[in-house]
Amino acid sequence: MKKIRENLFIQFLSFILLLLLIVTTVFTMNQYNAKKITRNNTLQLNENVLTQLIGKMDEMFISMQNLMSSVAYNPVVYAYYKEEEKRPLMQDDLKDVLINTLITDDYISGIELYNMEGNKLLGVGKKYTSTVSPEDINTIVYSEQILSDDGDNVKYAIYYPIYDLKNVQYFTKLGICVFYLSVENITDFLNEVRITDHTYLYVIDKELNLLAQNSIAKEDQDFLQNLEKIKDRYYVSEMKIDRNGWTIISYVPIT
């Protein structure tokens, strides 16, 4: 009888241990699946956010291009290029057109007009020095980094050719319109979205210069410097803006 009780106890104990093993396995699998689902959802959210940011920035460039077109072929601007002898009388009207354009867009810090010899006809806003020859600008061109004349701010230029509408078939250019893009406000795009509380967002240009970063990245200035040491703890995603070669990069912590 004693042996039977011992066998029953051993069987009961084995059953309990087996049950605990099953419960532990199920719990571990549930934890793993929950983490996997959370990770997949986070990565999908990251993909959606980057796509959204690309869309917003592309809309910004389209808006600026439309604005440049309206400036380049504004009757006052066009007449200023075509009727050289009347330029002194049109100076104030032309300046009003450029100033009104400047204040309608938060991303523009300066506007300049150049003739085909590369001489500046007029400029408003922050002063920069353009080194691009109008002869080389046949369509919209996005510049690399440009330093302002006072050395204080780095900006990017968008060059827009102005053609003689009466000689379009011969592609006769009158000059170029230059918009200087202020990149500080691009940070707002990055701060308007949220992936996780500890996700770093950056925008770099085609020369790998840093343009903008979200608030958490700005607070942690050592992050990029120590990237080689910590990059294995983050999912890294990149999306390029085809229009000008800029790239948005996200670092999502692995959990």
Where are these regions (language model features)?
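Extracytoplasmic/periplasmic ligand-binding sensor regions of membrane-associated signaling proteins
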Residues: L102-V183, F189
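Histidine kinase transmitter module recognition
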Residues: V23-V26, L53-K56, M60, V193
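Extreme N-terminal signal-anchor transmembrane helix of membrane signaling/transducer proteins, especially
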Residues: M1-K36, N40
